[in-house]
Amino acid sequence: MAQTPPPESAPSTDSEPETALETARRQLQAAAEHVDIADGVIERLTHPTRVVQVSVPVERDDGTVTVYDGYRAQHDDVRGPYKGGLRYHPGVSAEECVGLSMWMTWKCAVMDLPFGGAKGGVVVDPKTLSADEHERLTRRFAAELRDEVGPSQDIPAPDMGTDAQTMAWFMDAYSMQQGETVPGVVTGKPPVAGGSHGRAEAPGRSVAIATREAINYYDIPIDDATVAVQGYGSVGANAALLLDDWGARVVAVSDVNGGVLDTDGLDTHAIPSHGNQPAAVMRHDAPNTLTNEELLELDVDVVIPAAVGNVITAANADRIQADIVVEGANGPTTSAADRILEERAVPVIPDILANAGGVTVSYFEWLQDINRRTWSPERVRDELESEMLSAWNAVRSEVDDGDLSWRDAAYVVALQRIGRAKEARGLWP
């Protein structure tokens, strides 16, 4: 198992799009200006603790063998074990994993969870794998990462191209090597295999909670609020359903194929998520259709980019008409776009706060696994609501007291907590 040196991004310009690592480092430096924290701590947080690279040989169904590259970036563990997703995607790279692991560190800290950040994955298009090949890939990847992961060391979770079944296979492969069942090695498992109720809906639920609180903060009655959601997968669909149930008017939703628009409000319960029915959005009977780009520029109270990164850029930030942007995806707004939106006084509720429901309920799952005690769905929802409101109030206080953007305020909360932990622990040796 090789450990690759931390990747070094070339100095970034304002050209679009940025890599996840460039964006994460820019955001760190911007927030550091507002925090009384040692320069040495910021320098340490600019780099990961380690990046592990492994080769993952897999026997294909036809008997041939394909070797895939796998990565695990572990950013910082001063507050607890590393935590972050595993993705199967052709675009996985060491640099991407480092950038995403940094976001996980901030996300865990802003939620005050006892974890640090990690991210990993395999360079593969999961659509090219049969179910059996997917399982063999996962089990071999788990075997290669055995020394790097564990309930007190590094706890993976689902991400792009992986799901609850992937996590069950990973947990089983790890457990077979350990000689005992270790459900806490991963989160996002099926409830029958040590998973938690409410995990799948958690990121969307937290986005909905953040949207509700933002609407309230800016004195918009929720019954009058109009919402557009780009990305109707698990995050976007669950957020839209909840906001619809709470009284907001969801006027547009989209998936990779395009979107639908009804200014009177869509019946979100009549539109299956992209994961359940990939073509359902465009088949929905609505007065108008639109592109993903057009959805982002609708004149609504809230736009929720919940699909992929780098969709709000310097090229379209001037055309965003929403009063509030709530980030459902990871990194949907580039740094250049952030500056433009801030100049235009368009608040952006950042991803590290808005979509933190996934890692928060992963924490609940980890607690349930460690204690061998299952929580009810109602308890999971109530605990998530409580954790989200606590984090929201901490960030809101920084916004109000420090005259900061929501992103800078969230980073300030995270960096203060990480800085205090590093100061208390010191630097060894």
From Swiss-Prot:
One of its GO terms (molecular function) is glutamate dehydrogenase (NAD+) activity. It is an enzyme of class 1 (oxidoreductase). Residues 1-20 are annotated as: Disordered. InterPro entries: Aminoacid_DH-like_N_sf (IPR046346), Glu/Leu/Phe/Val/Trp_DH (IPR006095), Glu/Leu/Phe/Val/Trp_DH_C (IPR006096), Glu/Leu/Phe/Val/Trp_DH_dimer (IPR006097), Glu/Leu/Phe/Val_DH_AS (IPR033524), Glu_DH (IPR014362), GluDhGdhB (IPR054867), NAD(P)-bd_dom_sf (IPR036291). Keywords: Oxidoreductase. Gene3D superfamilies: Leucine Dehydrogenase, chain A, domain 1 (3.40.50.10860), NAD(P)-binding Rossmann-like Domain (3.40.50.720). Its EC number is 1.4.1.-. PROSITE patterns: GLFV_DEHYDROGENASE. One of its GO terms (biological process) is glutamate catabolic process. Strain NRC-36014 contains 4 distinct glutamate dehydrogenases while strain NRC-1 contains only 3. Belongs to the Glu/Leu/Phe/Val dehydrogenases family. PANTHER family: GLUTAMATE DEHYDROGENASE, GLUTAMATE DEHYDROGENASE 1, MITOCHONDRIAL. Homohexamer. This is Glutamate dehydrogenase B. It comes from Halobacterium salinarum (strain ATCC 700922 / JCM 11081 / NRC-1) (Halobacterium halobium).
